Swiss-Prot record:
The keyword Nucleotide-binding applies. GO terms for biological process: arginyl-tRNA aminoacylation. This is Arginine--tRNA ligase 2. Monomer. It catalyses: tRNA(Arg) + L-arginine + ATP = L-arginyl-tRNA(Arg) + AMP + diphosphate. Pfam families: Arg_tRNA_synt_N (PF03485), DALR_1 (PF05746), tRNA-synt_1d (PF00750). HAMAP family: Arg_tRNA_synth. The gene is argS2. Keywords: Aminoacyl-tRNA synthetase, ATP-binding, Cytoplasm, Ligase, Nucleotide-binding, Protein biosynthesis.
């Protein structure tokens, strides 16, 4: 709010672009030096003036300003906000949509490829990151004026289904498919790979079954349909628990009839070459290995389907930006796909983004399906919720909503524990750390919110904030909290544009920390009504920001813990 106003004013005075000014603005190391500082040293050469002289000129330009005082100190201009005026303006602004939904997207359609688990495999904890990062990005984009749609691009096609069918035909009678189909599918898949190490002909058998599937073989199609149906039932249970929804659930198979036209287009544009019986697009111009389009046995490959998918999302779903929330191990693949789209002449290929993320480890261990070492997300959630329930019950043995709150805290701890990290980094999930009610955790933020709601229940009915005496919330910890609340719209925009939900998670941790410092320094329910009302309004607005930010991240905020 105020930082933007100062940026705009400085940009106008100095004939600079606003983003240039924003990059130069600093937060002083001590509050006695002001709320914002602008260094003038980089301007000395272009303005042909000494930095202290530029600073003095800028101080004079802000003399008549009602909301801020500028003071030149050496080569810096330090800005001091008029605190009570700022507090009043902030609380008024918080009544407007612009605070809660700052529009930077102008209705642009963004298609988000997210979650995308593989059919016939369990919903392992390894699927969590794409699901919740994509979910948070959807809400960030929606908040900031974009028109996002969520697509679950199910892994329901590929040679692995030939292997799955071959395994089912050989050993399907050895597993309990009715009682637990997904676990049985995994058992069959693991057995196939163990047996294939002893008998290489099994790999050929798997390839042959996939070729039959692509050619419309009745038995192959029947089994594939069965695998898809049972898997979707399993996935939906997990999505309901995570609070995640989709606008479209379209597996790779949806694009089967669109791949031949893509191959034809590549041929017509002279982009395909033959390499050892396979068709590839050379990418030496981008310093990338060739992109495989059709394998030597005539079957399609991931890149073919992703090219067809991208074209569909742009032409049919009207995506102006296409986001792919997929792990970092697919970086080369997406570089190849995006560059092939460019070579095909699609200018919008520049609007395709790979939203990469690191591995999720459970106590330092990576997950794998091929060998069966997959950690089920449901097992992790059940374990975390059980521990959360025990912690809550210890403090509140007769909690009226114990199960509901434990679910919110447990699932929220898992989601927040992931999203608070830079998505590009590996995440090592440790249950005890994630569930702590102290430190940088989801439960800490939820506890802060519940504390605020408890205070508000004990307080008075709040008066019209326009007539408040804000001096009671603009000193020390109160001012520190207010300055953080001012930043919320800007944080939403920056987290969205950077595709970094962790910026919002870190922000809500800061809000919680600043509020708790304020809470421990001042009596909110003071005897003096004027003091009490001002502090209650600050508490209420803080709670609103916490709840709103956590909802964007996909974490619930119970009223009581």
């Amino acid at each position: 709010m105020l930082a933007q106003m100062i940026s705009e004013e400085l940009a106008r005075i100095l004939s600079l672009k606003e983003d240039e000014v924003e990059r130069l603005l600093e937060i002083p190391p001590q509050e006695t030096l002001g709320d914002l500082a602008f260094p003038c040293f980089t301007l000395a050469k272009t303005k042909r003036k000494a930095p202290p002289f530029i600073a003095a000129e800028l101080e004079a330009a802000f003399l008549e300003h009602k909301e801020v005082t500028a003071k030149a100190t050496g080569g810096y201009v330090n800005f001091f906000f008029h605190r009570e005026t700022v507090a009043g303006q902030l609380f008024q602004e918080m009544k407007s949509n612009q605070y809660w939904q700052p529009n930077s997207g102008d209705g642009k359609r963004v298609v988000i490829d997210m979650s995308s688990p593989n059919i016939a495999k369990p919903f392992g904890i390894g699927h969590l990151r794409s699901t919740i990062i994509g979910h948070a990005l959807y809400h960030l984009l929606k908040k900031t004026g974009y028109d996002p749609i969520r697509v679950n691009h199910l892994g329901d096609w590929g040679t692995q289904f030939g292997k799955q069918i071959a395994a089912y035909q050989r050993w399907g009678g050895d597993v309990d498919l009715k009682q637990n189909p997904i676990a049985s599918f995994l058992e069959l898949y693991v057995r196939f790979h163990e047996e294939a190490e002893k008998d290489e002909s099994l790999e050929d058998e798997g390839r042959e079954w996939f070729k039959k599937l692509e050619e419309g073989d009745e038995e192959a199609d029947r089994l594939w349909t069965y695998f898809v149906k049972e898997s979707l039932n399993e996935f939906d249970r997990m999505y309901n628990r995570l609070g995640v929804e989709f606008d479209y659930v379209l597996g790779e198979s949806f694009y089967n009839d669109q791949m031949a036209p893509v191959v034809k287009e590549l041929q017509e544009k002279g982009l395909l070459t033959c390499s050892e019986g396979a068709l590839v697009v050379p990418l030496e111009d981008a310093d990338l290995p060739p992109c495989l389009i059709v394998k030597s046995d005539g079957t399609s490959i991931y890149a073919t389907r992703d090219l067809a998918t991208a074209i569909y999302r742009h032409h049919v779903q009207k995506g102006e930006k296409l986001l792919y929330v997929v792990g970092g191990e697919q970086t080369l693949h997406f570089k190849q796909v995006f560059h092939v789209l460019k070579k095909m002449g699609y200018k919008w290929a520049d609007q395709c983004e790979h939203i990469t993320f690191g591995l999720l480890r459970l106590d330092g261990k990576k997950m794998s399906t091929r060998r069966g070492r997959v950690v089920m997300l449901e097992d992790v959630l059940n374990d975390v919720v059980a521990h959360a329930k025990a912690k809550i019950k210890e403090k509140h043995p007769n909690h009226p909503h114990l199960h509901e709150v434990a679910e919110a805290v447990g699932v929220g701890a898992v989601i927040f524990g992931d999203l608070k990290q830079d998505r590009r980094l590996d995440v090592n999930f440790r249950l005890e750390d994630a569930l702590s009610f102290e430190g940088e955790t989801g439960p800490y933020v939820q506890y802060t919110y519940a504390r605020i709601q408890s205070i508000l229940r004990k307080g008075d009915k709040l008066n019209d904030s326009r007539h408040m005496d804000w001096q009671h919330v603009t000193k020390d910890e109160g001012w520190s909290l207010l300055k953080v609340l001012i930043q919320y719209p800007n944080v939403l925009i920056k987290a969205t544009e950077a595709r970094e939900p962790h910026q919002l998670a870190r922000y809500v941790l800061t809000v919680s920390k600043k509020f708790n410092q304020f809470y421990h320094k001042y009596v909110i329910l003071a005897d003096d009504e004027t003091v009490r009302q001002a502090r209650l309004i600050l508490a209420e607005r803080t709670g609103e920001v916490i709840a709103d930010a956590m909802a964007v991240l996909g974490v619930k905020t119970p009223e009581e813990l």
